[in-house]
Amino acid sequence: MITVDQIKRVLPHRYPMLLVDRVTELVPGERASGLKAVTCNEPWYEAVPDDAPAEAYHYPWTVLLESWCHVAGVLVAWEEPNPDVLEGMAMLLGGVTDAEYHRPVLPGDVVEHHVRLARQVGETYMFEGESLVGDATVLSVGRLVMTMRPAAELKDPAGEVT
């Protein structure tokens, strides 16, 4: 099991955007699984009024997908971690196809992300997988493309990261 302190050594994300609490399975070059515990104390719920209906607490689907991507990021970078996006290799999302949100995720749910590396071409990775709450699929990802690029190549001529 990979705990949050170890995840922080691999991913550059920090609060409020570190969206994976634990990696429960990691087979480098093949697959990874991880957990995200959803709570009502997350920043996306700050503006929800006290008298709001349950639908107001649906976890944002874009954040759910980002959480799934964090598990993919751990899978890619585990053997060569670089949490500093200004140096070394930077992790970039290339695109997502066939992603489906199947049902709402609510505070109190524990989301289990499953990521499989479908193909690798050089420093470009193609993933597929799903996320579950209990036995229910809440997200399926047909294809997600991620790539690693030297951070130096991402700087503009003035030396700023773009």
Spans of model-derived segments:
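Hydrophobic beta-strand-centered segment that forms part of the acyl-chain substrate-binding groove
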Residues: 1, 72-112, 139-141, 146
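Short aromatic-glycine motifs in intrinsically disordered, low-complexity regions
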Residues: 1-14
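HotDog/MaoC-like acyl-thioester-processing domains
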Residues: 12, 105-162
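Catalytic strand-loop segment that frames the active site of acyl-thioester-processing enzymes
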Residues: 15-59
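Residues that act as N-cap/strand-start positions at coil-to-secondary-structure junctions
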Residues: 17-18, 93, 112, 125
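A residue-level detector for short acidic-glycine micro-motifs
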Residues: 22-27, 98, 103, 117-119
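Compact, glycine-rich, soluble single-domain proteins
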Residues: 49-75, 93
